């Protein structure tokens, strides 16, 4: 039965998401739920006494007020019955009955949407990686879905904004409520709404209360194909996002970080337990989705690609002699000559994969794509091996775009 939108708003606002969906499934209509006799609520399994009382004293006054506010602030109300309700949400264990959205319309089922999450207490490394990965994902045609809280979420949002392409920010409170009440916080909210989309399960005017973040995380995961966790401590809410993704059958990707850093202890543990895929850049995530979105995903712009290895200078003719002024002896600055290290002689210090990657780095290959191609190491092992070499101090990652040997590696004898 097609129900007036205000009945959907009434039911979604009255009860928690899972309970509201259970009531809807019982009556198959929010109007029927609103008009039902009190004794019928006793037939719905799992309802508390308080929830039954709320249903018995039903009123549409608040729903009318919410819809008036939505109309005034140009906030869209997407209900379970609507054609543009994302199919991805319907597959959730407890799909929301209503989603509020402000900004550009977004057809999620057509998007290679990737969620990004991370700790609020992000390290400079975590903030940079969140920003760089979000930027590359967006430039390659993906839709970044993230939060707006300081730390990794905010860095990811800024990275996507820098590209000029759409993004989605999922809020715990209303889409009209800045998380930070400063002028910069208000400008950020307006900027995201202009360039992308703000979404929430909470009606307008709702503050960003701590108890709402679980529902926010469920929506974040539900709208996405996979989740990137940048940094998370042992008790970070980001681990809740990762668990939700696993429960919904979404792949989880993790950016490896310093073993001794408290802000990455949780994400590193996901890698240790083989519960997540290690990644170093956005392109590594999208490798799993090219076949599903062949016309939407594309290579990163040239400015974002990893640098290729330099071409060696042409060899001199076989019979040519070095040109030299008469009476002058050519001086060679021996310090400027690169030192060649045969990593193959160091099997007691490095694994075969490490030797192959270190040799490729020494030959001048710097991008992960080039390193994989020239070392012969499979992508999953290459990523984890490079990460371990970085932690041991033999490989440097000055930007997320390329890798180099460190002085420690070059000084090996």
Language model features: what each stretch is:
Residues 1-81, 394, 400-401, 407-413:
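Short, small/acidic-rich helices and loops at N termini and domain boundaries
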Residues 1-3, 79-413:
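Glycine-biased, small-residue-rich flexible motifs in mid-sequence functional cores and linkers
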């Amino acid at each position: 039965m097609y129900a007036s939108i205000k009945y959907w708003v009434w039911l979604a606002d009255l009860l928690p998401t899972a309970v509201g969906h259970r009531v809807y499934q019982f009556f198959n209509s929010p109007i029927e739920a609103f008009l039902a006799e009190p004794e019928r609520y006793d037939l719905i399994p799992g309802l508390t006494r308080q929830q039954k009382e709320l249903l018995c004293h039903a009123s549409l006054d608040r729903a009318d007020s919410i819809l008036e506010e939505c109309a005034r602030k140009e906030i869209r109300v997407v209900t379970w019955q609507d054609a543009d309700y994302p199919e991805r949400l319907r597959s959730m264990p407890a799909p929301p009955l209503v989603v509020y959205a402000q900004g550009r319309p977004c057809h999620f089922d057509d998007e290679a949407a990737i969620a990004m999450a991370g700790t609020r207490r992000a390290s400079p490394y975590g903030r940079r990686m969140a920003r760089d990965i979000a930027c590359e994902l967006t430039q390659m045609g993906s839709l970044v879905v993230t939060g707006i809280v300081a730390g990794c979420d905010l860095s990811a949002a800024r990275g996507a904004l820098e590209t000029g392409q759409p993004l989605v920010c999922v809020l715990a409170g209303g889409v009209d409520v800045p998380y930070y009440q400063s002028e910069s916080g208000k400008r950020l909210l307006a900027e995201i709404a202009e360039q992308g989309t703000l979404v929430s399960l909470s009606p307008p005017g709702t503050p960003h209360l701590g108890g709402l973040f679980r529902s926010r995380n469920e929506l974040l995961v539900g709208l996405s194909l996979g989740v990137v966790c940048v940094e998370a401590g042992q008790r970070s809410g980001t681990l809740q996002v990762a668990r939700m993704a696993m429960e919904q059958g979404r792949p989880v990707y993790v950016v490896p970080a310093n073993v001794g850093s408290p802000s990455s202890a949780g994400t590193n543990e996901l890698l240790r337990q083989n519960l997540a895929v290690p990644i170093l850049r956005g392109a590594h995530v999208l490798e799993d989705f090219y076949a599903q979105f062949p016309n939407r995903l594309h290579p990163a712009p040239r400015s974002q690609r990893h640098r290729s290895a330099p071409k060696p200078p042409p060899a001199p003719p076989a019979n040519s002699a070095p040109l030299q002024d008469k009476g002058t002896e050519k001086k060679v600055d021996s310090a400027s000559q690169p030192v060649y290290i045969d990593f193959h002689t160091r099997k007691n210090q490095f694994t075969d994969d490490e030797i192959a990657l270190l040799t490729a780095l020494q030959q001048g290959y710097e991008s992960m794509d080039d390193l994989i191609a020239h070392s012969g190491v499979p992508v999953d092992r290459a990523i984890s091996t490079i990460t371990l070499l970085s932690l041991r101090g033999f490989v440097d990652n000055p930007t997320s775009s390329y890798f180099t040997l460190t002085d420690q590696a070059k000084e090996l004898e």
